[in-house]
């Protein structure tokens, strides 16, 4: 049976999640996270994917993104996750899948955008890693609170339809 086509609405925020294969830790070190963010920013810029929010956990990622075109989401994440898998496998002299299946994505209306951002940025609080979401270096919470931590710069000019 063929899988259903992904629903992508250009200029609309989307919540994206992707988990490590078999829930393995794939973003363990600061270097891993910096590599992932660099790839995401580079391929996002190349393929028209704006980044509004994110949280990088050890075994999964949450992204709030805005695709400029119907193929922006697919292409940016294909190249980001493909290149990250190559980095990860080279680091561990391994081969095979790094990510578990397809990434999940869902278009968001404005009320759901704020709920998804809260959910995303509260992930490390729920996991007991920090008490304040802005204290977690690997999410967009600090940037949204006005702190200028390295690695938290977001796409400020992502166009959102109707807003």
Residue spans of the language-model regions?
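Short Pro-Cys-Gly-centered "Cys-loop" motif that presents a nucleophilic cysteine in a tight turn
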Residues: 1-57, 66-163
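Glycine/serine-rich anion-binding loops at beta->alpha junctions
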Residues: 60
């Amino acid at each position: 049976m063929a899988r259903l086509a992904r629903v992508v609405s250009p200029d609309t925020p989307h919540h994206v999640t992707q988990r490590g294969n078999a829930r393995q830790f794939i973003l363990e070190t600061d270097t891993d996270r910096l590599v992932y963010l660099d790839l995401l920013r580079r391929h996002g810029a190349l393929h028209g994917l704006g980044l509004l929010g994110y949280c990088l956990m050890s075994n999964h990622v949450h992204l709030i993104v805005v695709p400029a075109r119907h193929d922006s989401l697919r292409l940016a994440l294909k190249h980001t996750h493909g290149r990250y898998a190559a980095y990860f496998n080279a680091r561990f002299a391994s081969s095979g899948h790094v990510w578990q299946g397809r990434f999940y994505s869902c278009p968001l209306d404005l009320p759901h955008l704020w709920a998804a951002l809260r959910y995303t940025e509260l992930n490390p609080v729920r996991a007991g890693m920090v008490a304040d979401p802005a204290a977690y270096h690997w999410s967009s919470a600090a940037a949204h609170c006005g702190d200028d931590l390295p690695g938290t710069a977001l796409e400020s000019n992502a166009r959102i339809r109707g807003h």
